[in-house]
Amino acid sequence: HARIFLKKILTGYSENYMELRSPCGAGIGQMAYYYDGNIYTCDEGRMVAEMGDQMFHLGNVNYSTYDDLMENRVCKVTCQASVLESLPGCCDCVYHPYCGVCPVISYASDNSIYARESNVYRCKIYKGILDILFEILFEEPDAEDILKTWI
């Protein structure tokens, strides 16, 4: 993740990593197709289905059109739930331009597609990585040139 964050910080461009977007890529930047033809918002959504919960099921290749998938309520709600500017704790976070949330992981861990505020494990990890990167960039004169070689 550090390399992805660095690219956003130093160039303003993103790798388009689905979980570090706002909104996330579930359903709009990626979909997961299962062997039985079922289509899910993402691979994480497919894994939730493997556990018996069809929460992130969008349709089936045998009867769903692309428009059906895009108009599916699950696709829309998953997208809406990952817009950082609308999430408490994310909307006013200094790091939100670099970050993203995964509604599927939020659902799997908390039974809600809406991420909890800053006590979320992934949030703590991302903030820790970003804290260290910015600290290095501000305190080490040659750091930017060295870190640019990572991207």
Regions found by a protein language model. Give the residues of each.
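C-terminal accessory region of radical SAM enzymes
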Residues: 1-13, 45-91
